[in-house]
Amino acid sequence: MKNLKLFLLGLMLCAALPSQAWDRTRHDAIAYIAECNLTPRAKRNIARYLDHSIVYYASWMDKYRDTPEFRNLEHVSYVDADMQLVDTLRKGKTNCVVELMHAIDRLKDYRNMSDSLVRLNLMYVIHIVGDMHCPSHVKYPGCKSGRADLNGKKMSYHAMWDWGVLDGAHGWSYSEYRLLLDTFSKREKAGMAKGTPREWLYETAVACRVIYDWQRADGTYGKQFVTDTYLLPERQLILASYRLAAVLNDLFG
């Protein structure tokens, strides 16, 4: 009973994320590519704690993002002027990447944890490794989202990088992302997956700061903009996939 209460408390705690990164298709694509790069042993061990494929849980946290009771987790990753993760935020809030690192640390001892807590932390890792690579989920000093019109569709500039640009470029299903993007050699995949969540966030912050240089005063973006920019979120998606696989293989493989 105590473990169940802890699980439910943790679930409500993680429900604090008020805005999603990527959308379901992109989250599913990241998880599916990661799953296809898991070792057999990692797959077997993970299956002990999850009832379905990791794809099933890829966007679970977004379902709870509007829950008002808990606001202690930030849904974006704050960085400072040097593109470094800001660990301590205002009013006691916690950077979600910091909590991700805590979840990974806890899972290193998963054999001595209750099944429900392993499941919760595993679901958290699956979601946030994807989230942290989304171009619009790095919060830079002085940068704001604003409104946007992409090929006649009204949305936020934030949402353009969650899904708008990639939808405009491809319109692929999550399985098509795997078929068409998971084409790197074993050595290339290992190179992309090197590092830690803190280092990955720094790389993401450096790579994705340019989206605010691309922001237009009139908020209007067309097909040429998509053509010129889609490789950035596409690259972030594949990095997230291989890094998620690396984390899970390291923990459960």
Regions found by a protein language model. Give the residues of each.
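Bacterial N-terminal signal peptides that target proteins for export
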Residues: 1-8
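Hydrophobic h-region of N-terminal signal peptides that target proteins for export
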Residues: 11-19
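N-terminal, motif-rich segments that launch catalysis or mediate targeting to/interaction with membranes
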Residues: 18-128, 135-253
